[in-house]
Amino acid sequence: MKKIAVITPYNNEDFNLIKKANESVKLQSNNQFNCEHIIVVDGQDTNEVLKKLDCFSLELKENYQDNGDTPRSVGTNLAISKNYDFIMYLDADNWFMKNHVNTLFDLIKLEDGIACSYRAFYSMEGEKLDYLEDSDCLKKKHVDTSCYLIPKNFFKFINIWHLIPKPTSQWCDRIFFHHLNLMRIQFKFSEKHTLAFRTLYQVHYKNNKNLMPKNIKENSKINERVYDYFFDENNQETFN
């Protein structure tokens, strides 16, 4: 029986969101593998809700304000030290759809690559959006952080979360994917949309403008902040 650690950074999101994420993890286990949910609190579990869930939780006491990168790093180290066979990541407002993990597991039974899925898009209220997937994901040039199944063979490559500069944390998934590519790791794609992704990004609402939330994120503004950081001469030594 293989052990899979599913790592979630938690920043006191609505209880119903983390509850759905947690329930989706527990429903994945079968006679080949067991999924265990590790929730790392970015600060403190203010309302003490995690004790209501079937999970292992850990509080960092301080909020690191880096888009969950520090909690992912701590969770990754914990999973490695506890000798898990696979690691996955799941944001607190997302959830695994039926058969998500099994579909990925079947791709890499030889553990010779990292398995990846596509996303299905939902509003923050959980309404299905008419949006297929970002074009770079469909072209296999990007993978969302919540879409990986990573075997133990590749654990030595993956814990870079704490090294990502805080001003670029909104791009952490792209930096992570780029790093894996530099390591020449083989990706295997299920091409199934089995990760349910609640989105605040404007581009995902182009066919459902009536569902667009007030606190929408504009990709161009996020990109501008990241570009400003990367092209600032004072920051170049970070990447040397």
Which residue stretches match the model-derived regions?
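N-proximal low-complexity "stem/linker" segments adjacent to membrane-targeting elements
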Residues: 1-24
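Short, acidic, metal-binding catalytic loop of nucleotide-sugar glycosyltransferases
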Residues: 20-34
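Short beta-strand/loop segment that forms part of the nucleotide-sugar
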Residues: 33-44, 59-61
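Active-site-proximal specificity loops/subdomain of glycosyltransferases
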Residues: 46-82
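Short beta-strand-to-loop acidic/aromatic patch adjacent to the donor-nucleotide binding site
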Residues: 84-95
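Conserved donor NDP-sugar-binding/catalytic core segment of glycosyltransferases
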Residues: 102-129
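A recurrent flexible, glycine/aromatic-enriched loop bordering the glycosyltransferase active site
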Residues: 129-149
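C-terminal catalytic/acceptor-binding lobe
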Residues: 163-240
